[in-house]
Amino acid sequence: MALNGFLEFFQKGKTFRPKKPFASGTIRYSLHKQAQASLQSGINLRQVVRLPQGENLNDWLAVHVVDFFNRINLIYGTVSEFCNETTCPTMSGGSRYEYLWADGDLYKKPTALSAQKYIEHLMDWIETQINNEAVFPVSTDVPFPKNFIAISRKILTRLFRVFVHVYIHHFDRIVSIGAEAHVNACYKHFYYFVQEFDMISAKELEPLQEMTSRICKDKD
């Protein structure tokens, strides 16, 4: 399905935190609009994620990191009231996978947190990265940092863990509000993007491997 109904559907409900916009008139605003137009047209998602000819890879990555941050915030917002210290005492994906939080600041060592606390810290951390113009420069006159791809990989890897937790522990809520098709479409878009640019390791993708092979069948 096309993703054109995604934002309309989720913006009716609860947003976990404010959406991060792109500044009008910038290259990334134009790329964002181009990507949105492709999604709304229902084009094959494997083709949608490819770097447009002549465009800068870092700009393309930046646009998608912010977009996925916004979309996954919206998805988590629909289940956040059911995700608390009691229902989800650890940030996990079933019994086999548990994620520890470390940010080099408040949590210098990997620390077990509830899913709610982990995701709150994660979204704060990502927001800090996105708002830091030394990491996500607004002006084309300012170069991206040399480690921008590594930072993007870390952000996308951690956002994937939110998908893992939501799919394994809260998918009944997603189904109950009729959001299954929207969430699956967003996941497919995310998965094809991280595969196209090798942004997440195969080991990190393991928790949703079976589901991924079932729903991600778009041909090249």
Curated annotation (Swiss-Prot):
GO biological process assignments: signal transduction
The keyword Zinc belongs to this UniProt entry's keyword annotation: yes
Q: Quote the Pfam families the UniProt record gives.
A: Mob1_phocein
Residue numbers binding Zn(2+): C83, C88, H165, H170
**Coiled coil (UniProt feature):** none
* GO terms assigned for molecular function: metal ion binding; protein kinase activator activity; protein kinase binding
Gene that specifies this protein: Mob3
Taxonomic source organism: Drosophila melanogaster (Fruit fly)
Q: Name one GO cellular component term.
A: cytoplasm
* Name of the protein this chain belongs to: MOB kinase activator-like 3
Q: Does the keyword Metal-binding apply?
A: yes
Query: Per the similarity annotation, which family is this?
Result: Belongs to the MOB1/phocein family.
Disulfide connectivity for this sequence is none
Q: Which SUPFAM superfamilies match?
A: Mob1/phocein
Q: Which Gene3D superfamilies does UniProt cross-reference here?
A: MOB kinase activator
Superkingdom of the organism of origin: Eukaryota
- Tell me the keywords, alphabetical order: Metal-binding, Zinc
